[in-house]
Amino acid sequence: MKPTARSRRAAAVSLAGVAALVLSGCGSESDAGGDVDGSVTLGFVNGANTHFHQCLLKSVEETAKTEKATLYSANSKQDAGTELSNIEDMIARNVDALIVQTVNVDALEGDIAKAKSAGIPIYLTSVATSDLSDVLGVAKVDLKQAGALDAGWIEKDAAGKDVKVGIVAGAPGAASDLLVGGFKGALPATAKVVANQPGMFNPAKAQDVAENMIQAQPDLDYAFVANEEMAFAVRKAFDAAGAEDVKIVTVNGTDEGLAAVTSGEFSATVANSAMSIGQTAVKNTIGLLNKDKTVDKIANIPLVLVTKDNVSEAPQYCPK
């Protein structure tokens, strides 16, 4: 913790009271069990409400409690303006460090500048900017590689045949753009992307997209879906249209997703543990604040391509 944290906390009491009111609709406080005046105080700004984000929040909360840190949290609900407002509110609460799961990589520049001007370190999860000089650290997921792993499975399964591929992306920005970019970039020349539409990380929207996709492309061979929640809806739409043979590859590695791989509903998923990201973010933020030389600024979260053959190797996705 920075030496000035106690004095900054005292100076911002009135602002913190205002921030508590501002955050009451979208944030929460978790006193993790330590002495509030003597422990690290962290602010976690989450990006959305998908299953991934819910598991990430749970992991951050549980790890903060274990580390005896006080935690404030807020949700930006896929809106970059709300994200910056949440960061401003956390600054007013005078946290010792911010942990941010951004809604959009382009929003990070403003986030980092705002935190820097307030003298508060910022730690990023999942994605990062190319310039990390003003960042405390990052728990980084190579989302391009996640997409590429799914594309590699298709290349192997297609075995040189000409195939048609559909993409159900998430919401434009951050995770979805990186996933889809990595997937498209790694597809073999024999795989043609014939449809690419955003499902907005919303199962109902994804199902509608899939219904239109299979109607327009009845001979579709494969579909890449940007998360498992949407993938279940896409599977439902394809099956209802008699397209049970379309093979779906996706990303997450939830218990439900692994069961779908086992049953054959999904052909493959890339396990990207929200629990590991949250644990790493909290522990490394505290370690870096304490100038622990054993803690790396950049922590790479491992990815695992999961098929029927290696379901048991998938990491735990969400805290129980």
Per-segment meaning from a language model:
Residues K2-A12, A19-L21, C26-K320:
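A residue-level marker of the well-folded mature domains of exported/periplasmic proteins
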